[in-house]
Amino acid sequence: IKGGRVAKFAMNDKCAAGTGRFLEIMADRLGISQQQMAVLALSGEPTKISSMCTVFAESEVISLIGRGEPRENIARGVIDSVVSRVATMAGQATGAPYYLTGGLCENAYVVERLAALLGSPVTTSPQARFAGAIGAAIRAQALN
């Protein structure tokens, strides 16, 4: 941030695979809430989720459940896969500080893992999920 404005910005606009929606879908497949997934992940050993596509990852999670893989391991694997994707995007905007907006911000474990992977603090806020909507409203107001 320079002069109150965002200097570098990275966004996953290709698919849902690095988003809060991805976590919602995976939590639903596990039969738990996103908050429960974060708590479960704390005690899990990461199971590799190799699919980058939400549809294929969902099938992979269903298969893991069917094979009896512990849900905490799947939860950890899902979160680690999202964090890895986000860290790759954030790494393109080299250097701290990092700010995270969107649905992922509501998962404290995601924010914690992302900070660990980037080796730098990640800042967010309670309204971060609505950053896009707030920005659109400010822009619309400026146009009127």
Question: Which functions belong to the PLM regions below?
Answer:
Residues 57-90, 129:
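Adenine-nucleotide phosphate-binding core of ATP-dependent small-molecule kinases
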Residues 5-42, 46-49:
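Glycine-rich phosphate-binding loop plus the immediately following alpha-helix
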Residues 10-18, 77-78, 99, 104, ...:
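Active-site nucleophile and cofactor-binding loops and adjacent substrate-binding regions
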Residues 39-65:
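Histidine/lysine/aspartate-rich catalytic loop segments that bind and position anionic ligands
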Residues 20-24, 28, 125-144:
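Glycine-rich phosphate-binding/hydrolytic loop that grips phosphoryl groups
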Residues 1-3, 52-59, 104-119:
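Acidic-glycine-rich active-site phosphate/pyrophosphate-binding loop
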Residues 5, 9, 108, 135-140:
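Residues forming the flavin
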Residues 90-117, 128-132:
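Glycine-rich phosphate-binding loops at beta-strand->alpha-helix junctions
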